Amino acid sequence: MTETRTLQFESPRALQSLYANDIKLLKNLEDSLGVKVTTREGWVKLEGDSNHVDKAQQVFEQLEKARQQGVDIQKHEFNYALKAVSEERDENLGEVVSTKITTSSRKPPIVARSANQRAYVEAIQKHDVVFGIGPAGTGKTYLAVAMAVAALKKEQVARIILTRPAVEAGEALGFLPGDLEQKITPYLRPLYDALREMLEPEEMERAIARQTIEVAPLAYMRGRTLSNAFVILDEAQNTTTEQMFMLLTRIGLNSKCVVTGDVTQIDLPANKRSGVVEALQALKNVPGIATVYFTERDFVRHELVRAIIGAYQQHRSPAPSPRK
């Protein structure tokens, strides 16, 4: 049944703020939900199948509620609300983006971009060991680094330790030319990149020089006790079972450990079992440990990334066998 419905808003400016004053976003809503959208002054008219109009109204209601909660609605927020309604997910945009992490007085706070990201931040706040598992680009490492920097600034910990297995070199770094820093920097570059987005350059250099922030390969954690520290293990799918056990048993008093990885991207030799796969199974019922799983819905990179990954997955999936 075709229906026409008009929604009234407090002012033209308030309405325009719901779609970031970008008419392309309204076109995106039309294409996604199969409705016609007309807006003028402080109202918006929705035309189409009644079920589709219902969904379009839900999108505007979500956005208006978020606006009233103080959310600055931009392209990401609009598309997030649209996708949540399209997929019939019961998520509150305002609650999701109200989760903010302050890492520097000179830089804007880091904001959760999805319900899973919000759950991840809350899990890190409440638990001493957290596993963040899911595809690249979903914010696992970025949010963990933000939480670590925030904890350091609040003096909740005395240092940050960022580590990942240098699986590309089999962790046998000794044969590479240069000093230790020159050998390991290429493998740890993503962690440095995250830090640079959250700290001023001189602040980051000073913290690394004083070893308040330490970035090192996983092999260099052996034999240590990591007390009063926020430890992040990145690319954990490429740890062996022995390495994962080693790291988790290094955690000392007043420490947190966040382990991130993508179990679909394991680069270990075929005869080696991933340490994170074993840990997820062995530790699932241990109090004080939480696991948050991310999906393609949580992508925070360029919106084309989702389409690229989907296209590759479809291309690489085996073709069905012909019937005999």
Report each predicted region and the residues it spans:
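Short glycine-/aliphatic-rich beta-strand segments at the starts of folded cytosolic domains
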Residues: 1-16
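Flexible glycine-/small-residue-rich
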Residues: 9-11, 39-41, 48, 164, ...
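Short amphipathic alpha-helix segments
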Residues: 14-31
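Hydrophobic side chains in well-ordered alpha-helices
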Residues: 18, 56-59, 244
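Compact, well-ordered interaction domains used in eukaryotic information-processing assemblies
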Residues: 27, 33-36, 40-42
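Interdomain "pre-motor" coupling segment immediately N-terminal to P-loop NTPase/helicase cores
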Residues: 38-97
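Proteins enriched for Cys/Gly/acidic motifs involved in redox and nucleic-acid/cofactor modification
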Residues: 82-113, 125
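Conserved helicase motor core of SF1/SF2 NTP-dependent helicases
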Residues: 105-115, 122-233, 237-324
